[in-house]
């Protein structure tokens, strides 16, 4: 499969041109571990999970519309009204919050699988918020953007913050951390997972003891949803069993994606070349700093450098 790793592409993508769209990365994520500690009276589950970004994902091509305040989003997604799209909703939220009179043209280059548990929709929403905050010069803080993002989805603030994080509660308590940046083979089985079905299953563990982050990082990582998911979805079980032949492997989130971890890229690529054709998949490196935030840091640095150049007389 064609590589869409951000690290090589970003080097050529940090020059701003008037009227021309900029390409902003919208990275995937993995839940390196996921434990369910209990259930709140409101029905939400209490979790402990570790998020890490991947050097792989979608792209959003964004340009400012100065002639009006319209949000023009392409392409259309079948069976999804534009006003219900998370990208569109994120842009409108930011417009209203910061009283922005400008608009935007946004094109989604969709690469990540739908319903894979790698955060595609949440990442798209966060990239829209963070990128438009920069382009429109809305000047909202990361915390303000994260609060907006939380109204769109529980995982959106993680992508807005842009750093690998340990999340607790229902995901609202976030602690930045630095897990090892390993290489991963990620497979997407041909199953569409119902998160509601998984969390309503009576066999789902709901009493895993809470532990400190230090203790969790020192132990083998697990996902409490994994056994229930493979009991419901045979293709997930097949993909997981295939990966387990080569390396430690597990489910991310509630799936359907599964992943195996490797210390070196060559090992991951060698396994990926043997992948059964039935599975969509890719190889990516784990990143503790989001490629989106790395790009914005480069853009800000370039802009500051240009402003500080002496005039030539």
Swiss-Prot record:
<dbReference type="InterPro" id="IPR036554">
    <property type="entry name" value="GHMP_kinase_C_sf"/>
</dbReference>
<dbReference type="InterPro" id="IPR013750">
    <property type="entry name" value="GHMP_kinase_C_dom"/>
</dbReference>
<comment type="function">
    <text>Catalyzes the phosphorylation of the position 2 hydroxy group of 4-diphosphocytidyl-2C-methyl-D-erythritol.</text>
</comment>
<comment type="pathway">
    <text>Isoprenoid biosynthesis; isopentenyl diphosphate biosynthesis via DXP pathway; isopentenyl diphosphate from 1-deoxy-D-xylulose 5-phosphate: step 3/6.</text>
</comment>
<feature type="active site">
    <location>
        <position position="29"/>
    </location>
</feature>
<keyword id="KW-0808">Transferase</keyword>
<keyword id="KW-0067">ATP-binding</keyword>
<feature type="active site">
    <location>
        <position position="155"/>
    </location>
</feature>
<dbReference type="Pfam" id="PF00288">
    <property type="entry name" value="GHMP_kinases_N"/>
</dbReference>
<protein>
    <recommendedName>
        <fullName>4-diphosphocytidyl-2-C-methyl-D-erythritol kinase</fullName>
        <ecNumber>2.7.1.148</ecNumber>
    </recommendedName>
</protein>
<comment type="similarity">
    <text>Belongs to the GHMP kinase family. IspE subfamily.</text>
</comment>
<keyword id="KW-0547">Nucleotide-binding</keyword>
<dbReference type="InterPro" id="IPR014721">
    <property type="entry name" value="Ribsml_uS5_D2-typ_fold_subgr"/>
</dbReference>
<dbReference type="GO" id="GO:0016114">
    <property type="term" value="P:terpenoid biosynthetic process"/>
</dbReference>
<dbReference type="InterPro" id="IPR004424">
    <property type="entry name" value="IspE"/>
</dbReference>
<dbReference type="GO" id="GO:0019288">
    <property type="term" value="P:isopentenyl diphosphate biosynthetic process, methylerythritol 4-phosphate pathway"/>
</dbReference>
<keyword id="KW-0418">Kinase</keyword>
<dbReference type="GO" id="GO:0005524">
    <property type="term" value="F:ATP binding"/>
</dbReference>
<feature type="binding site">
    <location>
        <begin position="113"/>
        <end position="123"/>
    </location>
    <ligand>
        <name>ATP</name>
    </ligand>
</feature>
<dbReference type="GO" id="GO:0050515">
    <property type="term" value="F:4-(cytidine 5'-diphospho)-2-C-methyl-D-erythritol kinase activity"/>
</dbReference>
<dbReference type="InterPro" id="IPR020568">
    <property type="entry name" value="Ribosomal_Su5_D2-typ_SF"/>
</dbReference>
<keyword id="KW-0414">Isoprene biosynthesis</keyword>
<dbReference type="InterPro" id="IPR006204">
    <property type="entry name" value="GHMP_kinase_N_dom"/>
</dbReference>
<dbReference type="Pfam" id="PF08544">
    <property type="entry name" value="GHMP_kinases_C"/>
</dbReference>
């Amino acid at each position: 499969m064609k590589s869409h790793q951000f690290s090589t592409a970003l080097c050529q993508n940090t020059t701003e041109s008037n009227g021309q769209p900029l390409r902003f990365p919208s990275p995937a994520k993995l839940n390196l571990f996921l434990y369910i500690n209990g259930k709140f009276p409101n029905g939400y589950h209490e979790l402990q999970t570790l998020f890490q970004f991947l050097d792989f994902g979608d792209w959003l091509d964004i340009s400012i519309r100065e002639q009006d305040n319209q949000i023009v989003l392409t392409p259309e997604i079948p069976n999804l009204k534009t006003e219900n799209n998370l990208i569109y909703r994120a842009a409108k939220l930011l417009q209203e919050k910061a009283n922005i009179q400008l608009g935007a043209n946004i094109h989604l280059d969709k690469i990540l699988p739908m319903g894979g548990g790698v955060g595609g929709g949440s990442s798209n929403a966060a990239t829209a918020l963070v990128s438009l905050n920069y382009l429109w010069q809305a000047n909202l803080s990361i915390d303000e953007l994260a609060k907006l993002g939380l109204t769109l989805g529980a995982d959106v603030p993680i992508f807005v913050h842009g750093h690998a994080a340990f999340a607790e509660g229902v995901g609202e308590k976030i602690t930045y951390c630095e897990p090892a940046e390993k290489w991963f083979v990620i497979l997407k089985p041909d199953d569409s997972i119902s998160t509601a079905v998984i969390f309503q299953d009576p066999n789902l563990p709901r009493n895993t003891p809470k532990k400190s982050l230090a203790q969790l990082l020192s132990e083998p990582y697990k996902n409490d949803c994994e056994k229930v998911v493979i009991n419901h979805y045979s293709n997930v079980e097949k993909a997981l069993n295939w990966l387990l032949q080569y390396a430690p492997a597990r489910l991310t989130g509630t799936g359907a994606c599964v992943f195996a971890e490797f210390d070196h890229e060559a090992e991951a690529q060698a396994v990926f070349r043997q992948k059964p054709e039935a599975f969509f998949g890719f190889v990516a490196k784990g990143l503790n700093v989001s490629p989106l935030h790395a790009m914005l840091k480069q853009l800000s640095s370039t802009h500051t450098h240009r402003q500080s150049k002496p005039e030539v007389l």
